[in-house]
């Protein structure tokens, strides 16, 4: 049994802020994560730049991200890139049929400089063990 208590950050598209999708993803993450999970839309004030969000991410143990229509928006892309630079594990939450699954993010690909909602893609791989799960 895992006795460690973690701090996580839920990065997601602004297009799903205050929607049922955001609520379902957040509840799934909370119910499976052994620790406190920060949702910037619910727990942080709105900042004009990405820097305050990145400063917060520096303090977390894990970053969880979701794609919107197969892409990362610029904010989520920058949050993931920063977490990876800081050696903070990043996991993507993917919908496979009726199930939600975690995969480890191993790389990011910037696909646009101008479309802020289809800014990047991620490369992920399946994992056998998830150290942050509630048991």
Segments and roles (model prediction):
Residues 1-135:
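Conserved catalytic or regulatory cores that recognize and/or transform ribose-phosphate-containing ligands
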């Amino acid at each position: 049994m895992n006795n460690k208590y973690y701090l996580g950050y839920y990065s997601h598209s602004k297009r799903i802020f205050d929607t049922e999708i955001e609520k379902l993803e957040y509840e799934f993450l909370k119910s499976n994560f052994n620790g406190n999970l920060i949702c910037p839309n619910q727990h942080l004030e709105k900042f004009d730049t990405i820097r305050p969000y990145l400063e917060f991410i520096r303090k977390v143990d894990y970053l969880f991200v979701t794609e919107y229509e197969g892409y990362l928006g610029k904010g989520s892309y920058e949050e993931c890139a920063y977490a990876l630079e800081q050696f903070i594990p990043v996991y993507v939450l993917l919908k496979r049929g009726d199930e939600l699954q975690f995969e480890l993010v191993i790389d990011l690909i910037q696909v646009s400089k101008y479309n802020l909602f289809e800014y990047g893609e991620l490369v992920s791989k399946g994992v056998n063990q998830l150290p942050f799960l509630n048991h």
